[in-house]
Protein backbone atom coordinates (compact mmCIF):
# COMPACT_ATOMS: atom_id res chain seq x y z
CA UNK A 1 0.00 0.00 0.00
CA UNK A 2 1.47 3.37 -1.06
CA UNK A 3 1.85 6.13 1.47
CA UNK A 4 -0.31 9.24 1.21
CA UNK A 5 1.76 11.98 -0.52
CA UNK A 6 2.86 14.87 1.69
CA UNK A 7 0.96 18.16 1.18
CA UNK A 8 2.29 20.04 -1.85
CA UNK A 9 2.94 23.32 -0.03
CA UNK A 10 5.71 25.06 1.95
CA UNK A 11 3.38 25.53 4.91
CA UNK A 12 5.50 22.99 6.83
CA UNK A 13 8.30 25.61 6.91
CA UNK A 14 5.99 28.25 8.39
CA UNK A 15 4.86 25.77 11.04
CA UNK A 16 8.43 24.75 11.99
CA UNK A 17 9.06 27.58 14.44
CA UNK A 18 12.57 26.35 15.34
CA UNK A 19 13.94 27.01 11.82
CA UNK A 20 16.72 29.60 11.75
CA UNK A 21 18.45 29.08 8.37
CA UNK A 22 16.62 28.36 5.09
CA UNK A 23 18.60 27.96 1.87
CA UNK A 24 16.85 28.22 -1.49
CA UNK A 25 18.79 26.90 -4.47
CA UNK A 26 18.65 25.42 -7.94
CA UNK A 27 19.84 25.75 -11.50
CA UNK A 28 19.86 29.21 -13.11
CA UNK A 29 16.57 30.34 -14.67
CA UNK A 30 14.19 28.12 -12.67
CA UNK A 31 12.64 30.89 -10.54
CA UNK A 32 14.92 30.51 -7.53
CA UNK A 33 14.99 34.21 -6.59
CA UNK A 34 11.22 34.58 -7.09
CA UNK A 35 10.72 31.55 -4.81
CA UNK A 36 13.08 32.82 -2.09
CA UNK A 37 11.49 36.32 -2.13
CA UNK A 38 8.00 34.78 -1.96
CA UNK A 39 8.98 32.43 0.87
CA UNK A 40 10.46 35.38 2.79
CA UNK A 41 7.17 37.29 2.39
CA UNK A 42 5.20 34.33 3.76
CA UNK A 43 7.71 33.78 6.57
CA UNK A 44 7.43 37.45 7.60
CA UNK A 45 3.74 36.81 8.38
CA UNK A 46 4.60 34.30 11.11
CA UNK A 47 8.02 35.47 12.38
CA UNK A 48 9.17 38.49 14.38
CA UNK A 49 12.01 39.43 11.99
CA UNK A 50 13.19 37.89 8.71
CA UNK A 51 16.34 38.56 6.68
CA UNK A 52 16.54 37.67 2.99
CA UNK A 53 20.16 37.52 1.88
CA UNK A 54 21.52 36.97 -1.63
CA UNK A 55 24.88 35.24 -2.04
CA UNK A 56 24.50 35.19 -5.82
CA UNK A 57 26.91 37.67 -7.49
CA UNK A 58 24.11 38.39 -10.02
CA UNK A 59 22.10 39.97 -7.15
CA UNK A 60 18.54 39.64 -8.38
CA UNK A 61 16.85 40.75 -5.13
CA UNK A 62 17.10 44.41 -6.13
CA UNK A 63 15.47 43.61 -9.48
CA UNK A 64 12.77 41.44 -7.89
CA UNK A 65 11.61 44.08 -5.39
CA UNK A 66 12.48 47.11 -7.54
CA UNK A 67 14.62 48.47 -4.68
CA UNK A 68 18.40 48.77 -4.51
CA UNK A 69 19.95 46.59 -1.79
CA UNK A 70 23.59 46.48 -0.73
CA UNK A 71 25.81 44.73 1.81
CA UNK A 72 23.99 46.35 4.74
CA UNK A 73 20.62 44.87 5.74
CA UNK A 74 17.73 47.26 5.08
CA UNK A 75 13.96 46.97 5.40
CA UNK A 76 12.07 46.14 2.21
CA UNK A 77 9.57 48.95 1.48
CA UNK A 78 6.07 47.94 2.57
CA UNK A 79 7.31 45.59 5.34
CA UNK A 80 8.07 46.22 9.01
CA UNK A 81 9.89 42.97 9.75
CA UNK A 82 11.41 41.84 6.43
CA UNK A 83 14.89 43.05 5.49
CA UNK A 84 17.19 42.22 2.58
CA UNK A 85 20.88 42.45 1.74
CA UNK A 86 23.10 41.39 -1.16
CA UNK A 87 26.65 40.21 -0.55
CA UNK A 88 29.41 38.91 -2.78
CA UNK A 89 31.63 36.48 -0.81
CA UNK A 90 34.53 37.02 -3.23
CA UNK A 91 34.35 40.80 -2.80
CA UNK A 92 34.33 40.32 1.00
CA UNK A 93 37.62 38.44 0.95
CA UNK A 94 39.20 41.09 -1.30
CA UNK A 95 38.23 43.76 1.24
CA UNK A 96 39.82 41.72 4.04
CA UNK A 97 43.10 41.47 2.09
CA UNK A 98 43.14 45.18 1.24
CA UNK A 99 42.48 46.06 4.89
CA UNK A 100 45.41 43.87 5.98
CA UNK A 101 47.69 45.53 3.40
CA UNK A 102 46.68 49.04 4.51
CA UNK A 103 47.51 48.19 8.11
CA UNK A 104 50.98 46.85 7.15
CA UNK A 105 51.93 48.56 3.84
CA UNK A 106 55.71 48.07 4.19
CA UNK A 107 55.69 44.60 5.69
CA UNK A 108 57.21 42.04 3.26
CA UNK A 109 56.00 39.25 5.53
CA UNK A 110 52.29 40.04 5.15
CA UNK A 111 52.20 38.84 1.52
CA UNK A 112 53.92 35.62 2.54
CA UNK A 113 51.44 35.11 5.38
CA UNK A 114 48.51 35.60 3.01
CA UNK A 115 50.01 33.14 0.51
CA UNK A 116 50.46 30.63 3.32
CA UNK A 117 46.90 31.16 4.58
CA UNK A 118 45.35 30.81 1.12
CA UNK A 119 47.41 27.82 0.00
CA UNK A 120 44.54 25.62 1.20
CA UNK A 121 41.85 25.16 -1.52
CA UNK A 122 38.65 27.07 -0.80
CA UNK A 123 40.01 28.92 2.23
CA UNK A 124 39.53 32.38 0.65
CA UNK A 125 35.80 31.85 0.04
CA UNK A 126 35.42 30.07 3.37
CA UNK A 127 36.94 33.02 5.25
CA UNK A 128 34.62 35.39 3.39
CA UNK A 129 31.71 33.13 4.37
CA UNK A 130 32.87 33.30 8.01
CA UNK A 131 32.82 37.10 7.88
CA UNK A 132 29.31 37.08 6.39
CA UNK A 133 28.01 34.64 9.00
CA UNK A 134 29.57 36.68 11.81
CA UNK A 135 27.76 39.78 10.56
CA UNK A 136 24.44 37.98 10.02
CA UNK A 137 24.53 36.34 13.46
CA UNK A 138 25.21 39.69 15.16
CA UNK A 139 21.97 41.11 13.69
CA UNK A 140 19.81 38.61 15.60
CA UNK A 141 17.15 37.95 12.97
CA UNK A 142 14.52 35.38 13.88
CA UNK A 143 14.90 33.61 10.51
CA UNK A 144 17.44 34.01 7.68
CA UNK A 145 16.63 32.96 4.10
CA UNK A 146 19.51 32.61 1.64
CA UNK A 147 18.89 33.18 -2.06
CA UNK A 148 21.93 31.24 -3.20
CA UNK A 149 24.03 31.26 -6.37
CA UNK A 150 23.29 28.62 -9.07
CA UNK A 151 23.79 25.03 -7.94
CA UNK A 152 27.59 24.52 -8.00
CA UNK A 153 28.33 27.63 -5.95
CA UNK A 154 25.54 26.81 -3.50
CA UNK A 155 27.00 23.45 -2.55
CA UNK A 156 30.48 24.92 -2.13
CA UNK A 157 28.99 27.63 0.05
CA UNK A 158 27.29 25.08 2.31
CA UNK A 159 30.50 23.11 2.69
CA UNK A 160 32.52 26.16 3.80
CA UNK A 161 32.16 25.55 7.55
CA UNK A 162 33.78 22.11 7.08
CA UNK A 163 36.48 23.51 4.76
CA UNK A 164 37.28 26.26 7.24
CA UNK A 165 37.43 23.94 10.23
CA UNK A 166 39.91 21.68 8.40
CA UNK A 167 41.93 24.67 7.20
CA UNK A 168 42.18 26.16 10.69
CA UNK A 169 43.38 22.84 12.06
CA UNK A 170 46.10 22.75 9.37
CA UNK A 171 47.09 26.36 9.99
CA UNK A 172 47.36 25.71 13.72
CA UNK A 173 49.85 22.96 12.94
CA UNK A 174 51.79 25.26 10.61
CA UNK A 175 51.96 27.96 13.28
CA UNK A 176 53.60 25.65 15.79
CA UNK A 177 56.05 24.31 13.19
CA UNK A 178 57.00 27.47 11.30
CA UNK A 179 56.09 30.24 13.76
CA UNK A 180 59.60 30.48 15.30
CA UNK A 181 61.21 30.53 11.82
CA UNK A 182 58.89 33.32 10.62
CA UNK A 183 59.58 35.31 13.80
CA UNK A 184 63.33 34.87 13.25
CA UNK A 185 63.06 36.02 9.61
CA UNK A 186 60.91 38.93 10.73
CA UNK A 187 63.62 39.99 13.20
CA UNK A 188 66.35 39.76 10.56
CA UNK A 189 64.28 41.89 8.15
CA UNK A 190 63.60 44.41 10.88
CA UNK A 191 59.82 44.11 10.47
CA UNK A 192 57.11 43.67 13.02
CA UNK A 193 55.05 40.95 11.36
CA UNK A 194 51.55 40.32 12.56
CA UNK A 195 51.58 36.59 11.74
CA UNK A 196 50.50 35.76 15.28
CA UNK A 197 47.57 38.15 14.93
CA UNK A 198 46.55 36.52 11.64
CA UNK A 199 46.60 33.01 13.09
CA UNK A 200 44.97 34.16 16.32
CA UNK A 201 42.13 35.73 14.32
CA UNK A 202 41.66 32.54 12.31
CA UNK A 203 41.81 30.41 15.44
CA UNK A 204 39.22 32.69 17.04
CA UNK A 205 36.88 31.96 14.15
CA UNK A 206 37.05 28.23 14.75
CA UNK A 207 34.56 28.20 17.63
CA UNK A 208 31.91 30.23 15.83
CA UNK A 209 32.38 28.28 12.58
CA UNK A 210 32.11 25.00 14.45
CA UNK A 211 28.83 26.26 15.93
CA UNK A 212 27.52 27.25 12.46
CA UNK A 213 28.52 23.81 11.16
CA UNK A 214 26.50 22.12 13.92
CA UNK A 215 23.50 24.38 13.22
CA UNK A 216 23.59 23.67 9.47
CA UNK A 217 23.50 19.94 10.18
CA UNK A 218 20.60 20.26 12.61
CA UNK A 219 17.25 19.73 10.79
CA UNK A 220 15.45 21.63 13.56
CA UNK A 221 17.43 24.75 12.64
CA UNK A 222 18.36 24.41 8.96
CA UNK A 223 16.74 23.20 5.75
CA UNK A 224 17.29 23.52 2.02
CA UNK A 225 14.48 24.18 -0.48
CA UNK A 226 15.24 22.86 -3.98
CA UNK A 227 13.77 24.80 -6.90
CA UNK A 228 13.49 23.26 -10.37
CA UNK A 229 11.41 23.10 -13.53
CA UNK A 230 9.96 19.91 -15.00
CA UNK A 231 12.68 19.24 -17.59
CA UNK A 232 15.46 16.66 -17.84
CA UNK A 233 18.47 18.89 -17.07
CA UNK A 234 16.78 20.56 -14.11
CA UNK A 235 15.66 17.20 -12.70
CA UNK A 236 19.21 15.83 -13.11
CA UNK A 237 20.69 18.88 -11.36
CA UNK A 238 18.17 18.57 -8.51
CA UNK A 239 19.01 14.89 -8.02
CA UNK A 240 22.74 15.72 -7.87
CA UNK A 241 22.07 18.57 -5.45
CA UNK A 242 19.98 16.41 -3.09
CA UNK A 243 22.67 13.71 -3.06
CA UNK A 244 25.33 16.28 -2.15
CA UNK A 245 23.15 17.87 0.53
CA UNK A 246 22.66 14.40 2.02
CA UNK A 247 26.43 13.85 2.01
CA UNK A 248 26.83 17.17 3.91
CA UNK A 249 24.10 16.02 6.34
CA UNK A 250 21.94 19.05 5.47
CA UNK A 251 18.18 18.55 5.66
CA UNK A 252 16.08 18.89 2.52
CA UNK A 253 12.45 17.83 2.21
CA UNK A 254 10.83 20.47 -0.02
CA UNK A 255 10.95 20.78 -3.81
CA UNK A 256 9.32 23.65 -5.69
CA UNK A 257 8.55 22.80 -9.33
CA UNK A 258 8.02 26.07 -11.21
CA UNK A 259 6.56 27.07 -14.60
CA UNK A 260 4.12 24.16 -14.89
CA UNK A 261 1.37 24.13 -17.52
CA UNK A 262 -1.42 22.68 -15.39
CA UNK A 263 -4.49 23.35 -17.57
CA UNK A 264 -5.53 20.01 -19.16
CA UNK A 265 -8.13 21.73 -21.37
CA UNK A 266 -5.71 23.92 -23.31
CA UNK A 267 -6.14 23.91 -27.11
CA UNK A 268 -2.68 25.34 -27.90
CA UNK A 269 -0.63 22.59 -29.70
CA UNK A 270 2.71 23.80 -28.28
CA UNK A 271 1.24 23.98 -24.77
CA UNK A 272 -0.15 20.43 -25.13
CA UNK A 273 3.28 19.10 -26.21
CA UNK A 274 5.09 20.96 -23.44
CA UNK A 275 2.55 19.88 -20.82
CA UNK A 276 3.01 16.25 -21.90
CA UNK A 277 6.79 16.54 -21.44
CA UNK A 278 6.37 18.27 -18.07
CA UNK A 279 3.97 15.58 -16.83
CA UNK A 280 6.53 12.89 -17.71
CA UNK A 281 9.25 14.51 -15.58
CA UNK A 282 6.80 15.52 -12.86
CA UNK A 283 5.85 11.83 -12.48
CA UNK A 284 9.55 11.00 -12.08
CA UNK A 285 9.96 13.71 -9.44
CA UNK A 286 6.95 12.37 -7.51
CA UNK A 287 8.30 8.83 -7.73
CA UNK A 288 11.87 9.74 -6.71
CA UNK A 289 10.87 12.05 -3.85
CA UNK A 290 7.74 10.54 -2.34
CA UNK A 291 8.90 11.63 1.14
CA UNK A 292 9.21 15.30 0.03
CA UNK A 293 6.70 18.13 -0.09
CA UNK A 294 6.46 18.74 -3.86
CA UNK A 295 5.04 22.18 -4.56
CA UNK A 296 3.58 22.48 -8.07
CA UNK A 297 3.60 26.09 -9.20
CA UNK A 298 1.86 27.04 -12.46
CA UNK A 299 3.34 29.15 -15.23
CA UNK A 300 2.06 32.65 -14.48
CA UNK A 301 0.96 34.93 -17.34
CA UNK A 302 3.19 37.89 -16.43
CA UNK A 303 6.65 38.57 -15.00
CA UNK A 304 6.80 38.40 -11.19
CA UNK A 305 8.41 41.71 -10.21
CA UNK A 306 7.60 44.13 -7.42
CA UNK A 307 6.18 43.59 -3.93
CA UNK A 308 2.56 43.25 -5.08
CA UNK A 309 3.31 40.59 -7.72
CA UNK A 310 5.62 38.68 -5.34
CA UNK A 311 3.01 38.72 -2.55
CA UNK A 312 0.41 37.31 -4.94
CA UNK A 313 2.86 34.67 -6.21
CA UNK A 314 3.81 33.74 -2.63
CA UNK A 315 0.29 32.38 -2.04
CA UNK A 316 1.00 29.66 -4.64
CA UNK A 317 3.72 28.28 -2.34
CA UNK A 318 1.27 27.89 0.54
CA UNK A 319 -2.05 27.09 -1.15
CA UNK A 320 -1.97 24.35 -3.82
CA UNK A 321 -2.98 25.55 -7.28
CA UNK A 322 -6.66 25.14 -8.15
CA UNK A 323 -7.88 25.94 -11.66
CA UNK A 324 -10.33 28.85 -11.56
From Swiss-Prot:
It is found in: Cytoplasm; Endoplasmic reticulum. ATP binds at residues 27-34, 231, 258. The keyword Coiled coil does not apply. SUPFAM superfamilies: P-loop containing nucleoside triphosphate hydrolases. Zn(2+) binds at residues 268, 271. GO terms for biological process: tail-anchored membrane protein insertion into ER membrane. One of its GO terms (molecular function) is metal ion binding. Keywords: ATP-binding, Cytoplasm, Endoplasmic reticulum, Hydrolase, Metal-binding, Nucleotide-binding, Transport, Zinc. Its EC number is 3.6.-.-. InterPro entries: Anion-transp_ATPase-like_dom, ATPase_ArsA/GET3, ATPase_ArsA/GET3_euk, P-loop_NTPase. The active site is at residue 56. GO terms for cellular component: GET complex. The keyword rRNA processing does not apply. Homodimer. ATPase required for the post-translational delivery of tail-anchored (TA) proteins to the endoplasmic reticulum. Recognizes and selectively binds the transmembrane domain of TA proteins in the cytosol. This complex then targets to the endoplasmic reticulum by membrane-bound receptors, where the tail-anchored protein is released for insertion. This process is regulated by ATP binding and hydrolysis. ATP binding drives the homodimer towards the closed dimer state, facilitating recognition of newly synthesized TA membrane proteins. ATP hydrolysis is required for insertion. Belongs to the arsA ATPase family. This is ATPase get3. The lineage of its organism: Eukaryota, Fungi, Dikarya, Ascomycota, Taphrinomycotina. The gene is get3.
